[in-house]
Regions:
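Helical element adjacent to the flavin cofactor pocket in flavoenzyme catalytic cores
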Residues: 147-159, 181-245
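N-terminal Rossmann-like FAD-binding beta1-loop-alpha1 element of flavoenzymes
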Residues: 2-28
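C-terminal catalytic lobe of FAD-dependent flavoproteins
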Residues: 163, 192, 294-295, 335-417
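Dinucleotide-binding Rossmann-like beta1-alpha1 core, especially the glycine-rich loop
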Residues: 42-168
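Active-site substrate-recognition segment that forms the wall
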Residues: 45-46, 51, 55-94, 222-232, ...
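Short beta-strand to alpha-helix junction loop
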Residues: 103-116, 138-148, 188-207, 321-329, ...
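Glycine-rich FAD pyrophosphate-binding loop
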Residues: 21-41
């Protein structure tokens, strides 16, 4: 089939590869000059399927309210809040019920573990270099942090993930550069989870897709999707519509505005995350793989010759404005654990990305209800961890094959009830 993909983030690129590998004629439309320029650009890089859970969870509304009083809050409310932001927050709050959370957690983890398997298969089959390393530590500063981490540990246990609860001495043996002056009560070691550069993987897989015949059209903005059969789309600056046998929407936050004229109201909201990336100044002072500070919900990862520090969740506010306090938290956590590791006097990349999040957590995969239009949207902060599996699922559905996992609750009908 002749298939168009809208969006060349990690979701669009993996989808392009899987469809091209299936023998389809694939064209990818990307509004930026290169792939993975938005939410996929400077992520933490964690691929930890056992830790992929809905943000909508019991107790989270109260936790968010308490965190707003902290200077280094993991969750922040930006200004201004639009009507859409307020509606999203209301739906998110409703999804925090225990029954809803458990169902969505099961859906996410089915997809996350399958995606991890698919990522490993692609890495074995293709010459992809993406600064990969294995294993990470969840750092617990105090006994209270260990107590607060118990719900997350139970999730990991339930998922059957291999992990060890270790003391501070063992944690420092695994990551020798951890600052001895920062209090550490213990840690959780997850040896099989991995870290990798999401954008670098996307760029490498894009080449793989191109070798299979996929075309990538950069600086090309899709302004509208038609309802006609065969499927059609309209590109900015072009008077004539383009026709395809099928369209796959992978446009992140922009997906909602493209779907609305078709009668599909999909509540995707940008939940902003932050990261800083800096060159390593002294390798002996840098992490070997990755750590997660559980108190501040900040990840520190080693990506080749750089250190990346990522965290935060910000609802509302202006897309182009970087909140100074959010960035300061990242610098603080880096200094707490790995002082002197990074060259911070110049060349630091500070990034704010809009993660396309649905209120209840899981993405939407599969048929849209509009003839010829397929969806691969709403992966939130887990796009990197879910991308390879989501792409394979959508390719299988388009081909009329049964996917390898149960897709209950991952279709668009979940949002239209």
């Amino acid at each position: 089939m002749k298939i168009a993909i809208i969006g060349a983030g990690i979701i669009g690129v993996t989808t392009a590869y899987e469809l091209a590998a299936d023998g389809h004629e694939v064209t990818v439309f990307e509004r930026h000059a290169a792939a993975a320029e938005e939410a996929s650009f400077a992520t933490a890089g964690m691929v930890a399927p056992g830790s992929v859970t809905p943000w909508a969870a019991p107790g989270m509304p109260a936790k968010v309210l308490r965190s707003l009083l902290s200077r280094h809050a993991a969750v922040r409310i930006g200004r201004p809040l639009s009507a859409g932001d307020l509606a999203w927050i209301w739906k998110w709050r409703r999804a925090c019920k225990l029954e809803t959370y458990l169902a969505n957690r099961a859906r996410l983890q089915r997809l996350a573990f399958y995606s991890s398997e698919r990522l490993r298969q692609l890495s074995a089959d293709l010459p992809l270099e993406y600064e990969r390393s294995e294993g990470y530590l969840m750092l617990l500063r105090s006994g209270k942090d260990l107590q607060l981490a118990q719900p997350a540990l139970q999730v990991i246990r339930d998922a059957g993930v291999a992990f060890r609860e270790i003391d501070a001495a063992e944690a420092r043996r695994i990551e020798p550069a951890l600052n001895a002056d920062t209090a550490l009560a213990g840690a959780i070691h997850l040896p099989r989870d991995e870290v990798g550069n999401c954008r670098q993987f996307a760029m490498g897989l894009k080449i793989g897709a191109q070798l299979l015949g996929a075309r990538f059209l950069s600086n090309t903005t899709v302004t509208r999707i038609g309802r006609s059969v065969p499927a059609t789309l309209y590109v900015a600056g072009e008077a004539r519509r383009r026709r395809f046998d099928a369209l796959v929407l992978c446009a992140g936050v922009a997906s909602a505005s493209l779907l609305k004229p078709l009668g599909l109201s999909v509540p995707i909201a940008p939940v902003y995350g932050y990261s800083i990336s800096a060159h390593i100044r002294e390798p002996l002072n840098a992490p070997l793989s990755a750590v997660m500070d559980e108190r501040y919900q900040v990840a520190i990862t080693r990506l080749g010759q750089r250190v990346r520090v990522a965290g935060g969740a910000e609802i509302g506010g202006a897309p182009g404005h970087k909140r100074a306090a959010s960035l300061q938290t990242l610098y603080k956590v880096l200094h707490d654990w790995f002082p002197g590791a990074a060259q911070l006097s110049n060349g630091v990349q500070e990034w704010k990305g809009a993660r396309p999040m649905l209120p209840d957590g899981p993405p939407v995969l599969g048929a849209s209800g509009v003839p010829g239009l397929w969806l691969n949207i709403g992966h939130g902060a887990s796009g990197w961890a879910l991308s390879c599996g989501s792409a394979r699922v959508v390719a299988d559905l388009i081909a009329g094959r049964a996917p390898a996992i149960d897709l209950e609750g991952l279709g668009v009908e979940r949002l239209l009830r």
